[in-house]
Amino acid sequence: MSVQAPSVPDLRQQVHDAARRARGAARALASLSTETKNRALCTAADHVLMNTRTILDANTADLDAARAAGTPEAMLDRLALNPARVEGIADGLRQVAGLPDPIGEVIRGRTLPNGLQLRQQRVPLGVVGIVYEGRPNVTVDAFGLTLKSGNAVLLRGSSSAARSNAALVNALRAALATEGLDTDAVQLLPSEDRASVTHLIQARGLVDVVIPRGGAGLIDAVVRDAQVPTIETGVGNCHVFVHESADLDMAEEIVLNAKTRRPSVCNAAESLLIDAAIADVAVPRLTGALTAAGVTVHADPSEDELRAEFLSMDIALAIVDGVDGAISHINEYGTGHTEAIVTTDLAAAQRFSERVDAAAVMVNASTAFTDGEQFGFGAEIGISTQKLHARGPMGLPELTSTKWIVWGDGHTRPA
């Protein structure tokens, strides 16, 4: 007997039922002690490791299907797991357990002249939806950060990673059950039908925020169609600007690291800007180094290439007139992610840092450092490229809201 896929109304009901269960779990999570959450995170790390073979077998099946479908190598790298990566995923959970708990943190407080005592403190957001592409590590990163910040999470991953994500979520839910916690604190939504994304991002009143992680097409679609608040993350047309004062040895190392370390991630450099004052020397040296490393340099880039997030061994080259030319170019073509300047001129560095519109600005450092772990936040939920309510690598504080608590002593407000 064949089994029919659920109809669209059935899928909508399925997603909304999951969201309702998540709301119940979120209410319980909000009042958990830090000790309980940390113990659950460490248990989750243990369960991930105990299920390494199952997880890797599932990932192998995903990779085989992706290769058969002609998936580009850069995307296969994002999808792939191995024993070291699984161990890294488990370590990430333990790192989150070691981070300060943001819930209950008092941000500010004061006593009013009438004697009322005010304090503003952090509280969980509630139910967080994550829509993401073929990166299984996001499954566990999202779980770890949402659990520690007292939120429930609804995960809608890519169909290309469906088996890997299911194996990981099964391990995480088993860990929650071991600790006597509500397993609906983490749920994996169906990935076979794209309508599940629509039902998630339009579940107003059930989902508190949706965070899309992936390429420009995914992010634009979620932001455009969502009826719940969204936090835009990740599209990275990151530039490295080599100023006329730059040490070219340093510039070469930074450019190569920013482009070639992991070209498929959002903090990889996609554009190289060279000051016209040193173009005669810097262009052949830096493009030669990139070419030798296997990078295709687009020396006469089209408008589309100047705006591209290649996510591959490609980089656009542009010559600009000094620091102001670089600032103007970046503010036209950048995506607000990470921008870097290589310079020995303090004034140029300060001008660039102040006037470039980006979540992170690197001075004499690779764009690859824009990362929650590198910033000391532990795992990250994403890198926000918007300005409200979070910007840059999103750690635990960015997964909270605030509540005002006011203490009185029979206070009433005069007419």
From Swiss-Prot:
Q: Which UniProt keywords apply?
A: Amino-acid biosynthesis, Cytoplasm, NADP, Oxidoreductase, Proline biosynthesis
Query: Main localisation, per the record?
Result: cytoplasm
Copy the pathway line from the protein's UniProt record: Amino-acid biosynthesis; L-proline biosynthesis; L-glutamate 5-semialdehyde from L-glutamate: step 2/2
Q: Which reaction does it catalyse?
A: L-glutamate 5-semialdehyde + phosphate + NADP(+) = L-glutamyl 5-phosphate + NADPH + H(+)
Q: Name one GO biological process term.
A: L-proline biosynthetic process
Write down the superkingdom of origin: Bacteria
Q: Name it.
A: Gamma-glutamyl phosphate reductase
Q: Which organism is it from?
A: Mycolicibacterium vanbaalenii (strain DSM 7251 / JCM 13017 / BCRC 16820 / KCTC 9966 / NRRL B-24157 / PYR-1) (Mycobacterium vanbaalenii)
